[in-house]
């Protein structure tokens, strides 16, 4: 599995493309207009050498802090998941965290498929004015086998060191290469003990 990171997900969302996507997906016109009102009206000032410009309208960006924002970005990036979908490869995403999962008996084959899928991601990013942050990528190989040869197989992506890790966090859940979830259970137990000790001190 290759875990990607979109740089400035909310800030780089094109208003024009988002509204077009809503129309293409068949949303009612009033939904499109409400969304237009939600994302429009953002302005900024440019500062250079102590000089401040007049207000400039911003044509990209979704307001942060609203429960509507992650939903709009998921709609904006939905085409990416459709592009990644194939017989042995699929994508999952929540806001700027996107994961590509591929399955085969060979780690080398998986790495090649992940590289191909990543190229599709880059093509989508160029089309939508989005940038990925390869220095924040993470790679992990999963297997249930006792003998785990080849789990150190790297992936070749510009800007990413390509080395697989032993575990990573997916939407708050720690997963390891053996899919034992021991680290997640350990972290949960540590948090529970910390809260219990704090409660006992109050009592």
List each model region and its residues.
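Acidic/histidine metal-binding catalytic segments
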Residues: 30-35, 130-136
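Active-site palm subdomain of RNA-directed nucleic acid polymerases
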Residues: 70-105
